[in-house]
């Protein structure tokens, strides 16, 4: 994912920090400090992570925080700015154990990060393929989305057995945002223009 050469040019658009193997997730879900860390015991970003950031900065690749904790994500966003990363995405800022306060989100944005909100929070719960998670209201999701639409992207995080198809999930998300007071232009930022900008695609009017 470093310098693009020959037929491999632009194949890498994003590098995520650990997700299912993240230490934070293992602590919260299993009570065990196992997995792949992103910071040391003093809260400093690991040198290996800094090297990944340097690659992202050099090749203009997205650096995404994965399943890091809220405070870890803020630390990563700060370090990414220091290193020169131009596309830092804070993952799942509205979701489950990664859910941030509005003040934390604003701190990340002030550090130059983009915020990702996943609509899966409004689709899981009892009677679904992910029954053990508490469902978020569409109003609460919209409240996250309206914090800074110009610095946010929306994903579905779908693809699991027993859950809606990602396309259907995105359709439901867009309708929910419009029904809860967001303007079409704001929604377009988050589901169209901003994602395209991050992965280096042009958007036709």
Task: Locate predicted features.
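His/Asp/Glu-enriched short active-site or ligand-binding loop at hydrolase and phosphoryl-transfer sites
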Residues: 112-126
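N-terminal hydrophobic targeting/anchoring segments and the immediately downstream early-domain regions
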Residues: 1-18, 198-204
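Short acidic/histidine-rich active-site segments
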Residues: 148-166
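Divalent metal-coordination and catalytic microenvironments
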Residues: 15, 63, 115, 157, ...
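Mid-to-C-terminal alpha-helical segments outside catalytic/metal-binding sites
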Residues: 169-205
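Divalent metal-binding pocket/active-site signature
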Residues: 14-100
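Acidic (Asp/Glu)-rich catalytic clusters
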Residues: 5-12, 54, 77-82, 105-112, ...
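Charged helix-capping and loop-helix junction motifs
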Residues: 1-2, 46, 101-105, 132-141, ...
């Amino acid at each position: 994912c470093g310098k693009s050469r020959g037929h491999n040019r632009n194949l890498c658009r994003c590098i995520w920090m650990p997700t299912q193997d993240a230490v934070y997730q293992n602590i919260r879900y299993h009570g065990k400090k196992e997995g792949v860390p992103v910071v040391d015991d003093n809260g400093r970003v690991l040198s290996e992570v800094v090297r990944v950031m340097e690659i992202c900065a050099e090749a203009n690749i997205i650096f995404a925080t994965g399943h890091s904790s809220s405070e870890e994500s803020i630390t990563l966003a700060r370090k990414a700015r220091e290193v020169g990363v131009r596309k830092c995405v804070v993952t799942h800022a509205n979701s489950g154990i990664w859910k941030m306060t509005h003040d934390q989100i604003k701190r990340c944005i002030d550090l130059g990060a983009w915020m990702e909100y996943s609509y899966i929070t409004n689709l899981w719960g009892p009677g679904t393929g992910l029954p053990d998670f508490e469902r978020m209201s569409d109003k609460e999701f919209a409240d996250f989305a309206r914090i800074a639409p110009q610095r946010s992207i929306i994903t579905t995080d779908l693809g699991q057995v027993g859950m809606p198809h990602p396309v259907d999930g995105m359709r439901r998300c867009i309708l929910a945002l419009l029904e809860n007071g967001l303007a079409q232009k704001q929604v377009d930022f988050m589901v169209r223009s901003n994602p395209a900008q991050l992965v280096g695609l042009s958007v036709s009017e």
